[in-house]
Amino acid sequence: GLFSILRGAAKFASKGLGKDLTKLGVDLVACKISKQC
């Protein structure tokens, strides 16, 4: 579910890799939730 995706993204970001990718992912999720995309 969504929570496991967020947890996976947090784990990915905590490695210090793909921070830009993580930010894009978070932006995309926020966009879908607010239906602004």
Swiss-Prot record:
GO terms for biological process: defense response to fungus; defense response to Gram-negative bacterium; killing of cells of another organism. It holds the Pfam family Antimicrobial_2. It is found in: Secreted. It comes from the Eukaryota. Keywords: Amphibian defense peptide, Antibiotic, Antimicrobial, Disulfide bond, Fungicide, Secreted. Expressed by the skin glands. Disulfide bonds join C31-C37. The keyword Lipoprotein does not apply. InterPro entries: Antimicrobial_frog_2. Belongs to the frog skin active peptide (FSAP) family. Esculentin subfamily. This is Esculentin-2B. It comes from Lithobates berlandieri (Rio Grande leopard frog). The lineage of its organism: Eukaryota, Metazoa, Chordata, Craniata, Vertebrata.
